[in-house]
From Swiss-Prot:
Protein name, per record: tRNA(Ile)-lysidine synthase
SMART domains xrefs: TilS_C
Taxonomy, superkingdom: Bacteria
InterPro entries in UniProt: Lysidine-tRNA-synth_C, Rossmann-like_a/b/a_fold, TilS/TtcA_N, tRNA_Ile_lys_synt, tRNA_Ile_lys_synt_N
Domain notes per entry: The N-terminal region contains the highly conserved SGGXDS motif, predicted to be a P-loop motif involved in ATP binding.
Lineage summary: Bacteria, Bacillati, Mycoplasmatota, Mollicutes, Acholeplasmatales
Functional note: Ligates lysine onto the cytidine present at position 34 of the AUA codon-specific tRNA(Ile) that contains the anticodon CAU, in an ATP-dependent manner. Cytidine is converted to lysidine, thus changing the amino acid specificity of the tRNA from methionine to isoleucine.
Family: Belongs to the tRNA(Ile)-lysidine synthase family.
Organism: Aster yellows witches'-broom phytoplasma (strain AYWB)
HAMAP family according to UniProt: tRNA_Ile_lys_synt (MF_01161)
Length: 436
């Protein structure tokens, strides 16, 4: 019997959790690892799809007893709608539960080269990302756990030959023959034909490895860019500088957006990602927002790209600031280092002064006339997400006197002088454009 060569090395001093269905693939992997004296904890799932599933349980359980292996059994009652995806998620959860119990991060499954081919063809038929088109990886991480596929580059035929040579007991799952599932159609109709025409499985392995190399290079460039151009300041947490982003190749831009979504466990379609990239690169739409899910929006403004939770208050609008007014500027230094001077004539300012948020019809006064605050903010390139959260200083007649870092009314005369400062006011030189 030709030796089996695993896709990844396993250590004899480490414990591994292995999912075993009772089929030929998982029973062959279990047999091989037992022979290699790998420490194992076996997990078997009963999907309750037919009355004969107890036979698989007894087969796996007896094999574990004969080889002094830990055996863990779960019954999964999944809804028929989207059955396969729901079952996969439940299996992952239970496997991680057992791994945590035995204090090991390693979880093994018996996916093989034919499985890889099926997955790649499925991804091509449905569209995917570059990583998705590569099908499966030998190693993937999920929270604190590492899923390994030691048989990933071994053809199914070789596994069957191995099982026959060592007389390994196994049971076939009849659902693998049902052509109602696309995967089974690919398995029984498409792949057998392709195998007769080319060295299909060997080419699948080369294809997967080529895509993974390209993906790894692109992701490396993505991480380098984010390390250099991600803003971690309190007013723009985890925002990405827009200008250098626009200079990137489109494939890197797309991977950056994909990574942002991955970090929030957000899945979106290829077309949706394309629309985001198109919008970010549109110079005529400086303020855009994309609804990703109930918790997150992706925001583009004049200078940044960022994920934002619409349910959370913006950092610069947490609390209403306290306005401090004095005729002595030194008296306000301890309140705020940013002190504004306001000159005025008594007939042009009506006290007391107040602080309020921006309103739709607000108008600013200049020496040349008036201008709508909305237009002024657009010209100053104030991000849309910040415009409705601006604190304004107004007099008792609601005339706008001062907007921190943006505007001071210079049409009030020079008879008197006062100094203004905000206590508990969020300030940052990066908040707004400083153009005149």
């Amino acid at each position: 019997m030709e030796n089996i060569k695993l896709a990844c090395s396993l250590e004899t001093n480490q414990t591994y959790i292995i999912a075993v269905s009772g089929g030929v693939d998982s029973m062959a992997l279990l047999h091989y690892l037992v022979a290699q004296k790998i420490k194992l904890q076996v997990v078997h799932f009963n999907h309750l799809t037919n009355s004969n599933t107890w036979k698989n349980k007894e087969l796996v359980k007896n094999y574990c007893l004969q080889n002094s292996l830990g055996f863990h059994y779960f019954e999964l009652n999944c809804p028929q709608k989207n059955f396969q995806a729901q079952a996969r998620l439940l299996r992952q959860q239970k496997l991680m539960q057992i791994a945590a119990k035995h204090r090991t991060p390693f979880i093994l499954t018996a996916h093989h080269l034919d499985d890889l081919a099926e997955t790649i063809l499925q991804k091509i038929s449905r569209s995917s990302t570059l990583l998705g088109y590569s099908g499966m990886q030998i190693q993937t991480s999920w929270t604190d756990f590492i899923f390994l596929k030691p048989f990933l580059y071994i053809p199914k035929a070789k596994i069957i030959s191995y099982a026959a040579f060592y007389k390994i007991p196994f049971l076939e799952d009849y659902t693998n023959q049902k052509l109602t599932y696309q995967r089974n159609q690919i398995r029984h109709q498409v792949i057998p034909y392709l195998k007769t025409q080319t060295s299909f499985l060997q080419n699948i392995q080369k294809y997967q490895q080529t895509l993974l190399q390209a993906y790894n290079f692109i992701r490396k460039q993505t991480l380098l860019f984010l390390t250099k151009h991600t803003n971690h300041s309190c007013n723009q947490p985890n925002s990405i500088a827009l200008a250098p982003f626009l200079n990137l190749d489109l494939v890197i831009q797309k991977d950056i957006i994909l990574l942002l979504l991955e970090q929030k466990n957000i899945t979106q379609s290829f077309i949706f990602i394309q629309n985001i990239i198109k919008g970010i690169n549109n110079p005529y739409k400086p303020n855009l927002s994309w609804h990703l899910n109930s918790d997150w929006h992706l925001i583009k403004d004049y200078k940044h790209i960022k994920l934002m939770n619409p349910a959370l208050p913006l950092p610069f609008a947490l609390t209403k600031p306290l306005l401090c007014v004095s005729t002595c500027n030194l008296c306000l230094v301890c309140v705020c280092p940013l002190i504004e001077t306001l000159n005025y004539n008594s007939q042009k300012v009506s006290f007391p002064l107040k602080v309020r948020l921006r309103q739709p019809k607000d108008t600013l006064k200049f020496s040349f006339g008036t201008k709508k605050l909305k237009k002024f903010l657009i010209e100053k390139k104030v991000p849309l997400t910040q415009r409705n959260n601006l604190w304004l200083v107004v007099d008792n007649l609601d005339n706008i006197l001062f907007i921190p870092q943006l505007y001071t009314n210079l049409t009030l005369g020079n008879q008197f002088r006062i100094y203004l400062a905000f206590k508990n006011f969020f300030t940052s030189s990066n908040c707004f454009s400083q153009t005149n």
